[in-house]
């Protein structure tokens, strides 16, 4: 039996989770022992699908995994509040056979992409953005060049 299955809403989340969890000795960053896992993606690749059907997608994994983690963004048209999303999914998971101690829900507010696009020198390094040469941060440069709308939490 494997330790954990992660159900994520889309390919971007899958890449993020795999990028972290597939690093050598990743568990040390979490302060836990090593564990094995699977990452699965909602077939529709969206947050509402995980919200509505995540418990169904995870039912077969009750026999093969000890724990389940559901991860989705809170940002979609008509989305309930994050605490309601968490409560609803947990209720569905427990009704479908998971115990409350063996599963959890992570609701990312506002959404994963907004967290990734935070104003950070690490992001600038990843994009090989030369702040010193341009005398401006990457976020400001994108805004000045019309690539990041003023009221947006991330570029389109």
Show where each model-derived region lies.
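Helix N-cap/beta->alpha junction signal
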Residues: 9-10
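C-terminal accessory helical subdomains adjacent to catalytic cores in phosphodiester-
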Residues: 1-3, 14-41, 53-156
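Conserved SAM-binding loop
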Residues: 6
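Acidic-and-aromatic substrate-binding clefts and catalytic sites of carbohydrate-active enzymes
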Residues: 44-50
């Amino acid at each position: 039996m494997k330790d954990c299955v992660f159900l994520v809403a889309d390919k971007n989340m899958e890449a993020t989770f795999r990028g972290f969890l597939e690093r050598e000795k990743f568990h040390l960053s979490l302060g836990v022992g090593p564990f094995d896992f699977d990452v699965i993606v909602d077939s529709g690749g969206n947050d509402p699908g995980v919200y509505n059907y995540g418990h169904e997608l995870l039912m077969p994994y009750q026999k093969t995994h000890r724990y389940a983690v559901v991860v989705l963004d809170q940002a979609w048209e008509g989305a309930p509040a994050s605490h309601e999303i968490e409560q609803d999914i947990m209720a569905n998971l427990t009704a479908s056979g998971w115990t409350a101690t063996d599963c959890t829900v992570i609701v990312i507010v506002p959404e994963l992409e907004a967290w990734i696009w935070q104003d950070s020198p690490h992001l600038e390094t990843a994009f090989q953005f030369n702040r010193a040469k341009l005398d401006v941060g990457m976020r400001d440069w994108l805004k000045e060049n019309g690539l990041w709308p003023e009221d947006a939490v991330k570029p389109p």
